[in-house]
Amino acid sequence: MYPGTDYAGQVHIANVGIGPESFLGQSPEMYTYDSCEQHLPDRTSSGNKGTFGKALLVAGSNGMAGAAILAARAAYRTGAGMVKVITAEENRQILQQGIPEALYGSCRQLSESMEWADVIAVGPGIGREEQALECLKKVVEKSRKPLVMDADALN
């Protein structure tokens, strides 16, 4: 709670209602840098970017290109071989300069992009625009791939 409590005035500790039942029978897990290694497959020397996993990111509303760039970089750093970013058209040039190795698309290409991907992440900087809501609904309703949603997607 520190250093935030130094700036908060009087602090009250309260039960916010998150108990064991909140996790749907699953215990929360924490991974450290060292413990993650055992969960990752070894990379074969004959592999290439297409064999190391394809991540689809639905990220970055107009003016929020930075969130999409950070998410794409994180996907590469954690092992994705290929990353495709579905983002607002206004962000395309910024993203291509910030992370040129990534692929780009629009919400119109979302269905084919979901088929292409091995895993999908939705939310970094998508905001509350109508197009963001349409993309989010499409992913949640139609995709059967592993899905990560951040706070923007949940809002």
What are the language-model segments listed below?
Residues Y2-A151, N155:
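Small-residue (G/A/S/T)-rich helix-start motifs and N-terminal tracts that mark the onset
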